[in-house]
Amino acid sequence: MSTTIDMPGSSKAAKAGKPVLVTTPSRPGGWKKGVAIMDFILRLGAIAAALGAAATMGLSDQTLPFFTQFFQFEASYDSFTTFQFFVITMALVAGYLVLSLPLSIVAVVRPHAAGPRLFLIILDTVFLTLATASGASAASIVYLAHNGNQDTNWIAICNQFGDFCAQTSGAVVSSLVAVLVFVLLIVMSALVLGKKH
């Protein structure tokens, strides 16, 4: 960006009647620093989403108020191995995001350093895959809980276990928010690594 300023003086350019060009130096870091700050903020949001998903699913439990002599009707996350996988993977994703915060801070302090960003983009891709797999598998079980499957004689349980289904659905939505944030983090890091200036 350049600016022209007419200044009367004794310089040769001023005597010749030509405008003097003055350039303002660009700030080091510039837009890359802004992207790094946004990266840090998005990581905090993804931590909240992943922890919320793991906690909501882990605390999902409902017991029906009636029972027989031999059976008590209960639904909890540990009744489904897919939900157990979901809780473990979302806890791992949240743990990774917490451990990635120092590298994100390094990217804010040194916006032109490519090493931390490259390391983060590789690990973000790994944990994006893990979060997507656990979210999608839990979503399929939640769908079956809501709708059942008549071909296999699986009945929908959400008519009886409404609170349980609401909690598990909320956990799946929260995990998909974390997946969306991971996608944004990867795209932002790729843009910063792809631009030279």
UniProtKB/Swiss-Prot annotation:
GO CC list: plasma membrane
Entry-linked InterPro entries: CASP/CASPL, CASP_dom, CASPL
Bilayer topology annotation: Multi-pass membrane protein
Keywords recorded for this protein, A-Z: Cell membrane, Cell wall biogenesis/degradation, Membrane, Transmembrane, Transmembrane helix
Recorded coiled-coil stretches: none
GO biological process, one term: cell wall organization
UniProt-annotated location(s): Cell membrane
Cytoplasmic compartment spans: 1-34, 106-117, 193-197
Regions that span the bilayer: 35-55, 85-105, 118-138, 172-192
One Pfam family cited in the UniProt record for this chain: CASP_dom
PANTHER family in the record: CASP-LIKE PROTEIN, CASP-LIKE PROTEIN 1U1
Description of how the protein assembles with itself and partners: Homodimer and heterodimers.
General function of this protein: Regulates membrane-cell wall junctions and localized cell wall deposition. Required for establishment of the Casparian strip membrane domain (CSD) and the subsequent formation of Casparian strips, a cell wall modification of the root endodermis that determines an apoplastic barrier between the intraorganismal apoplasm and the extraorganismal apoplasm and prevents lateral diffusion.
NCBIfam families (alphabetical): A_tha_TIGR01569
Family statement: Belongs to the Casparian strip membrane proteins (CASP) family.
Record protein name field: Casparian strip membrane protein 5
